[in-house]
């Protein structure tokens, strides 16, 4: 399940629903030529309350330009953690594109208040200051991506390891390939184990190794 809350930069003039051809809602607005309508949406895998909390905390305004600038700043900060010495623009493009791809997942699944819905269908609460992650393609990422996270983002890497442990407790076994509070069981092997072990052996803080 996914919950969402949407805000428009101006009130809609009319709304129509269609439950015959599918669950479709059509909004109509009184706009003039060249006017821009900004649509802001927050999502939650927990509940409607989570979606509301997320939009209030993470999307408080309707300026697309500000969101764009914030996104660029965040990505520049992340990508600048590794600098390569080369004058070859093609080499830089390949390297930073690969680094960008490595940071697209896992993703934060908990809401801004730290709540998240587990594979058991129950809403759980992260420890204060921590986040719960999802979308673990462990078969693809245990060799290089996760060891890289322990260097570039140790706090996030610790939360990822704890997220795998928590998922295992809530689901009865460690995840193979989990996505949004569910187990897809894609790929072979059991690669949550080396991810967790690597984080524990590197003594990343915040991991319950006895769970």
Give residue spans per PLM region.
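Helix-terminus loop motifs that line ligand-binding clefts
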Residues: 116-120, 124-126, 156-211
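Extracytoplasmic/secreted proteins, especially bacterial periplasmic and envelope-associated proteins
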Residues: 70, 74, 90-97, 143, ...
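Alpha-helical support elements that line or immediately flank enzyme active sites
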Residues: 97-110, 134-158, 194-203
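Secondary-structure capping and boundary motifs in well-ordered enzyme cores
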Residues: 90-91, 131-140, 185-192
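A conserved hydrophobic secondary-structure block that centers on an alpha-helix together
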Residues: 21, 85-88, 131-135, 145-146, ...
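Acidic/polar, glycine-enriched structural segments that form the non-catalytic walls/loops
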Residues: 1-132, 174-176, 205-210
């Amino acid at each position: 399940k996914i919950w969402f809350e949407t805000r428009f930069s101006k009130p809609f003039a009319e709304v129509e629903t269609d439950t015959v051809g599918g669950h479709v809602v059509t909004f109509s607005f009184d706009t003039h030529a060249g006017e821009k309508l900004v649509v802001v949406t927050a999502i939650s895998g927990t509940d409607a309350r989570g979606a509301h909390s997320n939009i209030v905390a993470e999307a408080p305004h309707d300026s697309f330009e500000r969101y764009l600038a914030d996104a660029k700043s965040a990505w520049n900060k992340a990508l600048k953690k590794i600098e390569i010495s080369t004058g070859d623009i093609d080499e830089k493009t390949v390297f930073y594109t690969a680094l960008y791809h490595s940071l697209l997942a896992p993703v934060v699944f908990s809401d801004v208040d730290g709540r998240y819905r587990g594979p058991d269908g129950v809403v759980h609460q992260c420890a204060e200051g921590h986040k719960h992650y999802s979308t673990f393609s462990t078969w693809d990422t245990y060799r290089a991506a996760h060891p890289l996270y322990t260097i570039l983002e140790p706090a996030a890497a610790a939360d990822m390891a704890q997220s795998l442990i928590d998922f295992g407790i809530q689901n009865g076994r460690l995840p193979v390939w989990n996505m949004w509070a569910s187990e897809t069981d894609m790929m072979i092997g059991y690669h949550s184990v080396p991810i967790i072990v690597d984080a524990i052996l590197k003594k990343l803080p915040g991991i319950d190794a006895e769970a």
